[in-house]
Amino acid sequence: ASDVYKRQGRDMLANVDALGRPTPTARFMGGRDHELLTKGCVGSASLSDIAAVISKGIFIMPGRVPGVGPFPQARGGWRGAPPVGMAEKLASATLYLALMTQTCLALAGMGQRIILEGPLARNEPFARCLSALTGVAVHVSADATGTATGAALLLLKADHDPRLGPAVQPVDLPGLSAYAQNWRAYAQQAR
């Protein structure tokens, strides 16, 4: 068995894929986190807002929803200056969700591409940040029924999904790599 299943205390489990194989899974309450972090905000962050959050060192720490995710003991909160206004709140939340998603994918054993579906598939800055943080191609699904479509593709033995467009362009934001390293160090301390 892979050592991925031995990572205790990180909210991981084994699911089963459509072919009956064990699939490592890491999870967190991303939708709930987003709701709590962006309450009263409308829209999505711009890349310039994300760059401002990086340069100001505004961090959202894991643990908004206690007891779950890769840092279940963390207590959440802000590190550094709190965000000023809706734009910085949205940008901070976008970075946080991308970092948490990257962490979960790394724990579970990331593949060679990421396919986004659901509400975050409509958030281009999130997709572009995730691509930059993981170094993996990120595709956005235009299909609202990804699970059913995936099952059909397996049944038909199709090797690709025609509803996937080209991979998003990873962001190239000054300081993103250092920001991510700092966030990971802070998150590990909170574990």
Regions found by a protein language model. Give the residues of each.
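Active-site core segments that coordinate phosphate-bearing ligands/cofactors
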Residues: 2-115, 122-191
